[in-house]
Amino acid sequence: MSNEFLLNAESRSDTGKGASRRLRRLQERVPGILYGGEAEPQMISVELRELKKALENEAFYSHILTLKLDGADVQAVLRDMQRHPAKGHPLHVDLLRVDKTHKITMSVPLHFTNEESSIGVKKQGGEIQHNFAEVEVSCLPQHLPEFIEVDMANAELDSVVHLSDLKLPKGVELTQLALGEDHDQPVAAVHQPKVRASSDDDDAAEGEEAASEE
């Protein structure tokens, strides 16, 4: 994990919708909750500007974060976030404490590479279809990957890449595969592009339809 994310957090005692609105409007901070582990859930807030900057990086969503909270460093991951329905800015965050000795389950994005140069596309004229943009993994916090690469270079026409075909970092497991072979779902496939009807065919069809109506 090459990226490092640090958020300055503060404890808060005021709760409720009114308190949250004041926090966002007057202090430009985002309310949240920190839970998990052996400690009790804790109401917190983080700086809006700092959080928005971190959210611009895809890795933030699947990364161990460091919270500076009450003079201590707390390791956590983003579990959930509420956004404004129209403006899109964060309204509330749920953060889960992590312990380096306990596995966590997280969704990690897939990065598809070598698509245009793949055998099925470049040499055989196919198109690549994605079935998933992310997968759920289970691992120790220190093994959590920012993303999983799906190399399509050798994918031929009519071939399918399944979950079991993904190359995973050491110590990382796919939760779906742990459920059995029936859950080995297709991640991507190379197929023939759909043929669109030509304008001549469309004109002919319209002519036949018009003739049938006369």
UniProtKB/Swiss-Prot annotation:
Compositional bias segments (type: Acidic residues): 200-214
Disulfide bridge map: none
Span list, region Disordered: 1-23, 182-214
Listed GO CC annotations: cytosolic large ribosomal subunit
Swiss-Prot/TrEMBL keywords: Ribonucleoprotein, Ribosomal protein, RNA-binding, rRNA-binding
Superkingdom of source: Bacteria
Signal sequence residues: none
GO biological process, one term: translation
Subunit structure: Part of the 50S ribosomal subunit; part of the 5S rRNA/L5/L18/L25 subcomplex. Contacts the 5S rRNA. Binds to the 5S rRNA independently of L5 and L18.
General function of this protein: This is one of the proteins that binds to the 5S RNA in the ribosome where it forms part of the central protuberance.
Family according to the record: Belongs to the bacterial ribosomal protein bL25 family. CTC subfamily.
Name listed for the protein in its UniProt record: Large ribosomal subunit protein bL25
Organism: Alcanivorax borkumensis (strain ATCC 700651 / DSM 11573 / NCIMB 13689 / SK2)
Organism lineage string: Bacteria, Pseudomonadati, Pseudomonadota, Gammaproteobacteria, Oceanospirillales
